Amino acid sequence: MGQKINPHGFRLGITTDWKSRWYADKQYAEYVKEDVAIRKLLATGMERAGIAKVEIERTRDRVRVDIHTARPGIVIGRRGAEADRIRSELEKLTGKQVQLNILEVKNAEAEAQLVAQGVAEQLSNRVAFRRAMRKAIQSAMRQPNVKGIRVQCSGRLGGAEMSRSEFYREGRVPLHTLRADIDYGLYEAKTTFGRIGVKVWIYKGDIVGGKRELAANTAAPAGDRPRRERPSRPRRSGATGTTATSTEAGRAATATADAPATEQNQEG
């Protein structure tokens, strides 16, 4: 099941949080429809901004929208003109006062949505899909918090008549482990042969007790580990591995081996 389901939905309430935070009783369907419209509005015309995710939080008379982007200058615009335009359109859509927060993504190579968007842009520019996938994997694995990545492309790859799927993976990507912090991104590339779907999974370590544990940081250096002494084992005989003193033949062999030493001591 972990191979098929969306990693964010699979871990909701365990290691991931909701991207829409509000409560509604009879207006639930209306709010869900508004959230979809808000995200669609921010996605159209903002392809170059590199939007990683959009978080929506509602109160009784206000809607707060947090835009996580790799290029905040494009979203803000010259002297804030683009941000004002987005805010006015959101207020017209929701009918409430909108608080718009634009947050910069520091590490774009470690965000699955931005990696998928970068691969899709290269496919639209006629770059070979294998080269684009390998380049994205190499850039992501150079980041210190990335422990594994998987990139998959599906569609008419290379202009082939029959569509297929290919993926490359490096490092660990434990999709079925609930404590694993897995970032997931999906983007579609529009090519002359049709659309090609790009999916990216990025593993960033385990989350235990609300804290991320990285294997590289938790492992102790080899020189600092205390050495354990191996407990002494009884002498074994034969290919069967039986203890020498546990059989009649073993006891007889032991008595025969000890006899010459006893006789020498008596003669001395």
UniProtKB/Swiss-Prot annotation:
Residues 237-268 have a biased composition (Low complexity). Residues 217-268 are annotated as: Disordered. It holds the Pfam family Ribosomal_S3_C. One of its GO terms (molecular function) is structural constituent of ribosome. The keyword rRNA-binding applies. Keywords: Ribonucleoprotein, Ribosomal protein, RNA-binding, rRNA-binding. Belongs to the universal ribosomal protein uS3 family. This is Small ribosomal subunit protein uS3. Residues 38-106 form the KH type-2 domain. Part of the 30S ribosomal subunit. Forms a tight complex with proteins S10 and S14. PROSITE patterns: KH_TYPE_2, RIBOSOMAL_S3. The keyword RNA-binding applies. Binds the lower part of the 30S subunit head. Binds mRNA in the 70S ribosome, positioning it for translation. GO terms for biological process: translation. PANTHER family: 30S/40S RIBOSOMAL PROTEIN S3 (PTHR11760), SMALL RIBOSOMAL SUBUNIT PROTEIN US3C (PTHR11760:SF19).
